[in-house]
Amino acid sequence: MTRIEVVQTDEVTSSELQNYTEAFNLAFNLSISPKDFRSKYKSFLGFSFHSFLISEEEIVGSVTVIPMEYKLHNKTIFGGLIVDVFILPEHRSDPFHLLKMYRSLKPFLIQENITFSIAVPNKNVSTYWTKIMRFNTLGELDYNISIVDIFLGRIGHLGGILTSLLLAPLHLCNYVLTKGTNRNLKVMQLVRSSDFYEHRLKDTHKRILFRGHELHYVVGKERNVNVAFLLDFSSRLGDDANALRAAVKYIKNEERISLILFIGQLNLNQYLFWKLPKFLEPQKLPVIIDNLDNNDELLNMPLDLWDFTLLNYDVR
């Protein structure tokens, strides 16, 4: 017999915490510790919400919602980011477990004035979320790439220089093609604060402040290629195009990489990043939403107007 228990992060007992991390690591092939759990799910409220699927007093599944603060037309609203959804394979006989787990969470979210839940499901379950759980699709996140070294580091620093020379004509074309776009038109803005960065950024993430600019990135390897994932960039002067150029220049100077990747709707007059064609994307990244407040504007607002990038949801 299974049951569902909804708790806040600060209400999870030590035995539940140990049990959860074991199930989580098994589901995602990771090795987080109970200590990681506390910091991972901290939010501006001080906690997240967890819906545990329990069988024989063991946690065998979970849905977590992290409260996040946004500004809609400069008015503060609260959203919930759905993350770390899993059900262990031997407990998937009931196809409605996930639906029941999420529905059990909703009253707690509404009680905390959370007006929407948002998620980026993988391709294996995205249909379930939209057809069974009745989430609406806002759109798909773009892959934007900046090529640093087409020689993949084989000829040292010369590779970056030659790459810049070879791509110069394409950069000019890109600048012309993106003329007229404006990142500042985004009406749904993620609220960035010191508390947000404290719980969002991990040890592997780099937060750089220099010359009035701020950038956040993490370096990883994708298919044996060294990649810098640009999470966010901004300028104290409000010039995002200049901040993007400064971010790319900094990363190129500091890291041995071949590509810089920015995932999200860039919407900026710039020449450094190219939007990857849909047929070349490694996987689709649909953004889906559950409107908890019956706010029609949320459902009708295209993803281009959302400030939604790896800084919001990435689990790296």
Which sequence ranges carry the predicted segments?
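Conserved acetyl-CoA-binding loop-helix of GNAT-fold acetyltransferases
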Residues: 87, 92-109, 239-250
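Short, glycine/acidic-rich beta->alpha junctions
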Residues: 45, 97-101, 121
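Short, intrinsically disordered terminal tails adjacent to the first/last structured region
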Residues: 1-5, 310-312
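Long, hydrophobic/aromatic-enriched structural stretches that serve as scaffold segments
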Residues: 62-70, 74-103
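Mid-sequence acidic-hydrophobic segments that form the walls
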Residues: 66, 85-88, 104, 108-112, ...
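Amide-forming acyltransferase catalytic core, primarily the GNAT-like/NAT-type
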Residues: 4-6, 10, 15-62, 69, ...
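Short loop segments at secondary-structure junctions
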Residues: 56-58, 88-91, 291-293
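Active-site/acyl-donor-binding loops of N-acyltransferases
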Residues: 40-43, 49, 66-67, 115-169, ...
